[in-house]
Amino acid sequence: MAKFIDQVKIMLKAGKGGDGMISFRREAHVDKGGPDGGDGGTGGNIYFVADLGKNTLLSFYKNKFIIAEDGVKGGPKNLYGAKGKDTIVKVPLGTLVYKNKKIVADVIKENHLYLVAKGGKGGRGNNKFKTSKNTAPRIAENGMPGEKYEANIVLKILSDVGLVGLPSCGKSTLINALSNAKAKVAEYEFTTLVPQLGLVKYYDYSYTIADLPGLIKGASLGKGLGIQFLRHIERCKVVIHIVDFGSLDKDPIQSYEAIQKELESYKLNLTQKPQLVVANKSDLANFKNNIEKFKAKYPNIEIIEISALNYHNVENLKKIIWEFLEKTSHLQIKIEDDFETEVKEINYEPDFVIQKMNQNHFKVTGKKIEELVLKIPINTFDNLMRFNNILKKIGVWEALIKRDIQKGDLVEIYQHKFEWEEEL
């Protein structure tokens, strides 16, 4: 059986955009051919898509670094570089992707591509920089880097119905009887270590059902399999509480109260969810006696009597669950953020920051400056002049002069180092 993993950190790196090209038309009988350097292709994106056959994030343990293909650089004759190939990753339904504590994607639909990392924009070729004043520009741009970050991947099983109960209450037997699931069944506790998903068909209708591993007292505090599985109940529309009413060594009242307490103690108070109580193991002799005791203490709780092993009343239970889902169809699944609420603030970050490292050394940084350095390669005189003009336009040179920069001083702009001249 696959190990159940429902939270993992991975690196995502979308493709870099292809570089633009510097090229000039060179053909026989064509005098003074103009610029024909093409643009680079966009970098590949990374998408997540739901796979109903998956119920664990185990695959990310084997591959914690996911990348997409880079875009191809532009070519001569105005040829555009090809777009980088997208990477599509199959994940369980109910997978959430977090970046810096903010939800990037919530995989809640089938057959839908969820963008989790965007590829970088391709650089422009020199054909795009032709003007009446510069008919032969030796200017091109680098492709921009694709989005890269450490993603926190969290799985919260997405199902119409969630089965809960103490170990060995018969949940696995019931999901097998109700659906197409093939959950492991045995006469010992904690047979279910991985949530099992099944599809229940009721005439022309269907709904999904999840068998969640058995809970024990203190689960809401993390005991046993604990809180790891309680969070999966958050995303179920309806909770079916299975109680063993037939075994001689089980007290159904205590069993019922123990689970209700754990559901109530969880941070979202899961007892507020629509809930059905199912009394299992009606084929055993002690069943009727326990039913009477339970009804005496909880006369207002409606219970559904079944034997999952013998399929007694299972078809009727399918109908009851469907009708219950229909009654609660107006309720929306509440998606709670496991992390701190992010407050959106206006970004007052300046275009650039100047630091005086010593008497003759100035350092220029900033998000806009970094983007400029990445975009413009200093490999031709025209590119250098463009780089210089943009810095001048946004006020970097004026700011350096106000900081009393002198001829010969060093100006460091990320990987570039220049010597200051009096006239720029």
Swiss-Prot record:
Compartments (UniProt record)? Cytoplasm
A single Gene Ontology CC term: cytoplasm
| Top-level taxonomic group | Bacteria
The reply to whether Transmembrane helix figures as a keyword in the UniProt entry is no
Q: Binding of Mg(2+): at which residues?
A: 172, 192
Alphabetized, the UniProt keywords read: Cytoplasm, GTP-binding, Hydrolase, Magnesium, Metal-binding, Nucleotide-binding
Q: Which PANTHER family match?
A: DEVELOPMENTALLY REGULATED GTP-BINDING PROTEIN-RELATED, MITOCHONDRIAL RIBOSOME-ASSOCIATED GTPASE 2
Family (UniProt): Belongs to the TRAFAC class OBG-HflX-like GTPase superfamily. OBG GTPase family.
Complexes and interactors: Monomer.
Protein name as it appears in the record: GTPase Obg
Gene behind the chain: obg
